[in-house]
Amino acid sequence: MIEYQTAVLDNGLRIIALQTASPVVYCGYQINAGAAHEQSNEEGIAHFCEHVTFKGTTRRTALDVINCLEEVGGDLNAFTTKTDTVYYSAILKEHLPRAISLLTDIVFHSVYPQKEIDKEVEVICDEIESYNDSPSELIYDEFENLIFHGHPLGHNILGASERVRKFTTKDALHFTQQHYRPDNAIFFAYGNVDFNILLQLLSQENGTNVTTVGELDKHLEKPLPVLSAYEPQTIKIDKHTHQAHVMIGNRAYAVHDKRRMALYLLNNILGGPGMSARLNLALRERRGLVYTVESTMVSYSSTGLWSIYFGCDTQDVDECMALVRAELDHFIEKPLTDSELTIAKQQIKGQIGIACDNRENLALDFGKGFLHYGWKKDITALYRNIDAITAEEIQAVAQELFVEEQLTKLIYE
């Protein structure tokens, strides 16, 4: 199990540190505020705030923010998801005080000057248009909007250019004052970090003291509005592109649903990253119909999403759809054999082990799990859960989620 330590400051900030011998420290603030926390009239504001948070604080100019870590070889980055916004750095251990000072400053003391916003809006809109020009990326957002139609989970993270151009300093302050609070965030650090020094630095920068050291008794997941009933649909959109893009899927399981692990394994068998994934073998290796075919799943606190994506020549859409249907029917009708199940478990455990060797991704994953769900990433326990999955559980998931009449389809032609 990965060694970690936790604490809470008087202002409610949660702290988690993972120990490793690496001289590089990955650290940052993970804030419980993403696209799903936006109001319907402010879609795109979370991502907008992520951009303009770098444009100056009460004691640093935008150029100061850029130079602070770069002049010692460090890296400063950020990203927005449906459920959170993350500001983080990669820095040599000796520069940790500098990183904590900068990260705390931009997260809690940014001023969002309108002059800087006016320039950055053009950058954001260029990002949006670039995304709109990439149907293989755009289709994921539009599909999620179909699955969660009318719900904040269906919000497009980037938003629309016409709305983003109207955002002001006042809008940024309104959103961040509501969500960018110490008691709505977690600070994570992964590296060769002295925990007592880490607490001292964070207490100093936050102007507060340590309340608790040890296990944290609750997570910070915010309840989202109740989902409306799911209604599968098929939508075709003429994109005037040479290649067709197709997504097929269904609502799936929430994070704490016991069926989620069976879907996790089934999804990897069906369309995971391996070339031996069933869909890759059927559509690409045997017939050469696609370059990319994959299946994905995501779980939120109260629901989830499972989907398949492929891109092919427009004249091959029907054949590819039939092949996908045949693979789904196979899982519905036949349980995995013992040898198939054993190989599938070995494969996914190997993938997990290799992924955990990426310290940056592990730090971000650990922070997210701890922020929303109170998870402590225990690889041994995860392997035990995988080993406990049965062929019958996998078949039951397929029989629930893969039924043709329950699938939503989005096709760009």
Mark where each language-model region is.
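Charge-rich, well-structured scaffold segments of protease-associated domains
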Residues: E3, V8, D64-H219, P225-V226, ...
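Short, conserved beta-strand segments within well-ordered enzyme catalytic domains
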Residues: I16, Y26-Q30, T53, N77-F79, ...
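Active-site SXXK
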Residues: G44-T57
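N- or domain-start disorder-to-order transition segments that initiate the globular core
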Residues: M1-V25
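Short pre-active-site segment immediately N-terminal to the catalytic Zn-binding motif
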Residues: A33-E42
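His/Glu-based metal-binding/catalytic segments typifying zinc-dependent metallopeptidases
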Residues: Q19-P23, G28-Q30, G214-S276
